[in-house]
């Protein structure tokens, strides 16, 4: 995991981004370190279906982190040897949440969680319990790259196969934390390599 600061060259606005490497599956979007999200949901009820009530939940200060998600994860699938850089579409998740349901059982669950679903019963994300007895994996705002695929945008335009080249994963991970100057230098090297490959194979540039 790496925390960096990105600056908009047009507006000069700076904002933090948390770069993370995760396996394909559960992905933490926010730690909810002040433990505000779960108590808010618990105060509303076990099944929340009213649209106005759901809108008020998202507008509540406890859910401010939902509109400030700054996680850029490199997702890897070791079995299929492929990787993907995904961005969670928080605005779409918010707009398409049809109901929120408290779940206390299943999949070896030790603590309850509130799960968010769309109108087709598709999983979007969840708020985990997270009190003093819970560890870092049992609290905060989470989603799942397998179960919530429609709510992600792929920076790499889909999965990238690295079965033939493990260096590719290192290239992605290093590129995420390097500067624009570093990107330019690397790009020139890659362009030169492509030119060499074309020449070796008799392909016109």
Would you name each region that the model predicts?
Residues 16-18:
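Elongated alpha-helical scaffolds
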Residues 1-2, 7-12, 21-205:
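Nucleic-acid endonuclease domains
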């Amino acid at each position: 995991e790496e925390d960096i600061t990105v600056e908009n060259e047009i507006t000069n606005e700076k904002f933090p981004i948390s770069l993370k490497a995760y396996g394909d599956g559960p992905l933490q979007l926010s730690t909810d370190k002040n433990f505000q999200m779960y108590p808010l949901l618990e105060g509303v009820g076990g099944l929340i279906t009213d649209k106005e009530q759901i809108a008020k939940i998202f507008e509540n200060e406890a859910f401010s982190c939902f509109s400030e998600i700054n996680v850029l994860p490199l997702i890897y699938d070791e079995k299929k040897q492929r990787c993907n850089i995904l961005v969670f579409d928080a605005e779409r998740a918010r707009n398409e949440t049809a109901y929120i349901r408290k779940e206390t059982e299943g999949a070896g669950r030790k603590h309850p969680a509130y799960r968010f679903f769309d109108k087709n019963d598709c999983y979007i994300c969840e708020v985990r319990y997270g009190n003093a007895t819970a560890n870092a994996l049992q609290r905060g705002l989470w989603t799942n790259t397998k179960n919530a695929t429609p709510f992600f945008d792929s920076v790499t335009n889909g999965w990238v196969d690295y079965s033939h080249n493990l260096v590719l994963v290192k290239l992605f991970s290093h590129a995420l934390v390097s500067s624009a100057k570093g990107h330019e230098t690397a790009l020139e090297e890659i362009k030169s390599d492509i030119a060499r490959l074309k020449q070796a194979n008799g392909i016109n540039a």
